[in-house]
């Protein structure tokens, strides 16, 4: 049967990459943790390949995170969406490797992100001239269990030598092969960032619970229509809001969410007597206003409950 990564099968120098991608797709339905690990191995191969092509030093002890935030990788992709997609795979891969318990939606999104990363990279490197969007109907049901490999081999010389130098140094961003659905993408990225910071979602809209992250929380006192709905509110153990998160369309500048988030924060302050820390994000870029008098700054993830308490106490 056809799979999404079949196109790699006959490209001999990409045999290792094909193994990782194929393993990820085969286990997506049957073993979410394994799928996430296969995706992470594929990502690691890709990152190392980009460094090798750029003659950049990988270094013995550099972590995947260090390589991914390094200039060779970031400048090569030149697209916030793909960089965020790569970090998504890295983070879910970490969950799979340590605690386990990757969800079906997370495994699927890892696979989709891997497809876009591999495709975008190979198109930019002119290894491919075209690639169809990801087709989720091709994912095998109850696929075989394939144990992820422990190590990631270096890209073979044959591959490195086959790529034209001008493609490696090209300023053109790597293309996006499969468009992300706005809502799904934003939600999956934000939910993972919350999970990463130790926040548990309530699981039902407009429910405020101590120590949990509530979604679509009704707030009163908004200008014009009085009632508004905050995308996420993070509650402390006393049931008061520690933070509010406003998510805007990924295609929009996240600053559009800033004004909205500030309005929600003010309404929550009027209700609870405490001003929440403000986050606004488009899923790919996230900013915080901590209420300590600093201008908004970009961050890689949300604060944990403890860190938010520290911010509140420092005011």
Give each language-model segment a name.
Residues 1-155:
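Amphipathic alpha-helical interface elements
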Residues 123-315:
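ATP-dependent helicase/translocase motor core
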């Amino acid at each position: 049967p056809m799979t999404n990564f079949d196109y790699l099968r006959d490209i001999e120098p990409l045999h290792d990459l094909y193994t990782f991608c194929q393993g990820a797709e085969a286990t997506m339905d049957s073993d979410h943790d394994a799928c996430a690990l296969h995706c992470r191995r594929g990502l690691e191969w890709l990152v190392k390949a980009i460094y090798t092509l750029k003659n950049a030093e990988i270094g013995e002890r550099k972590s995947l995170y260090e390589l991914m935030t390094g200039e060779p990788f970031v400048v090569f992709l030149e697209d916030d969406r793909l960089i965020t997609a790569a970090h998504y795979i890295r983070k879910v891969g970490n969950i799979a490797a340590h605690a386990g318990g990757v969800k079906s939606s997370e495994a699927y999104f890892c696979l989709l992100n891997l497809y876009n990363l591999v495709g975008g990279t190979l198109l930019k490197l002119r290894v491919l001239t075209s690639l169809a969007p990801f087709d989720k109907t091709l994912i095998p049901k109850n696929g075989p269990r394939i144990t992820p490999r422990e190590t990631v081999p270096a890209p073979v010389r044959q591959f490195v030598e086959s790529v034209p130098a001008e493609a490696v140094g090209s300023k053109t961003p790597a293309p996006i092969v499969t468009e992300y659905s706005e809502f799904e993408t934003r939600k999956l990225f934000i939910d993972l960032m919350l999970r990463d910071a130790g926040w548990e979602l309530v699981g039902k809209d407009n429910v405020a619970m101590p120590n949990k992250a509530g979604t679509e929380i009704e707030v009163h006192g908004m200008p014009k229509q009085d009632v508004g709905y905050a995308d996420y509110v993070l509650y402390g153990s006393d049931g008061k809001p520690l933070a509010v998160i406003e998510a805007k369309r990924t295609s929009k500048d996240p600053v559009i969410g800033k004004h909205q988030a500030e309005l929600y924060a003010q309404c929550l302050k009027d209700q609870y007597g405490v001003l929440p820390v403000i986050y606004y994000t488009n899923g790919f870029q996230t900013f915080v206003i901590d209420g300590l008098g600093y201008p908004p700054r970009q961050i890689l993830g949300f604060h944990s409950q403890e860190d938010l308490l520290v911010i509140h106490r420092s005011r």
